[in-house]
Amino acid sequence: MNGEKPLRERKKKMPYPSPVTEEPISIMSLPYDLLLNCFSLVSRLYYPTLSLVSKTFRSIITSRELYEIRSRLNRTDKCLYLCFPYDMNTHWFTLCREPNRNVAENSSGYLLVQVPSPNGLLPVHSSSVIAVGSNIYKIGGTKSYRHKLWKRTRYSSSVSVLDCRSHRWRQAPGMRVARGCSSTVCEVDGKIYIAGGCKEDIGSLYWIEVFDPKTQTWGTLKNPCIEYQHDIGYRCEVKSLGLDGKIYMFGSEFVVYNFEEDRWKCIGRDKYNLYHAVDPMSRINSSSCVVDNVLFILDKGTRVFKWYDFKVSLWKELNGVEGLPDLSDRGYVKMVDLGGKIAVLWQECLTNKKIKRIWCAEISLERRDRDEIWGKVEWFDIVLSVHSSFSLLCADTISVVV
């Protein structure tokens, strides 16, 4: 039909608009405050790995603001630190967790990673080491030097502090008295109590010193005037234990300091077996730790985990702990509080190799009734391989809140 309009004009096809491709938003482009909030919700176990991503991440992870937010949100974790003395240097490690995509099959994903430590610090086995809050305090120490033909020992009064948030070291005010490796240290209500290990007379005013981290000042505590215990082994020492808001001291006498009464008094013979928890040369104790104000040990002979019941002054078996390898031939064992759980470390020497493996297990705890505590092995795995000369016998395990 020439010249006539078609009955229905065909609609012209309009070209479809090409899809707009939006570039993915990089986490690096997020505002700093938002990143802080995101990181505060992540477990501290992942921080060592995250710090390797970029300088920005590393800056956030070591910032004071991050840990203030974590504290306000009640997101703090208890983290495990392990220190090996080796030669004149010390090697510090912390337990962390690998990202899920990097975890091998049948692996727990946990490992110990090294923390920077400056040269020049006195060997840790000659010092007293303890944690308060997010800081590890390395107190005193022994340094040997040669004077003419004689080898002499010098004690130190210095205090080095590792901030476990930034992994930076600093110096704290020194003690009034220099102390060596035979000093004993404990923590009660956020204060550090260190005794002995000095050349002062046993009745000296400064035989016990007290450090308050809040005021950064040293003070003294009434002296119990107990002598060194001579049957601990090759060294004469006094041992201490901070538990239930009290200080227990074990030497020639066994005494306890009650802060409410402001006095020392002898503990009853029914509590003498508490001594097994602090004496590494004890026939019973292999290692010990305090979790939620309950004292736990690993029995050397039976390799059974036990806890101390103050009501009846007896050690009771921790029920339900199954699945761990036989620890009787694993050398020295360490235990430490891991946020309401027990972390257990032991070593394994590889035959014909100069390598030693460090194993770690995590045991969760449950109180049933009031007279029973049950444990469950959550996982155990190899977390570190070191030179065979490293030994848990001289190592320190510390639990830090960050």
From Swiss-Prot:
Matching Gene3D superfamilies: Kelch-type beta propeller
Domain of life: Eukaryota
Cited Pfam families: F-box (PF00646), Kelch_FKB95 (PF25210)
Kelch repeat ranges, renumbered to this chain: 135-189, 191-240, 246-293
Annotated protein name in UniProt: Putative F-box/kelch-repeat protein At1g61540
F-box domain: residues covered: 24-70
Keywords from the UniProt entry: Kelch repeat, Repeat
SUPFAM superfamilies according to UniProt: F-box domain, Kelch motif
Organism the protein comes from: Arabidopsis thaliana (Mouse-ear cress)
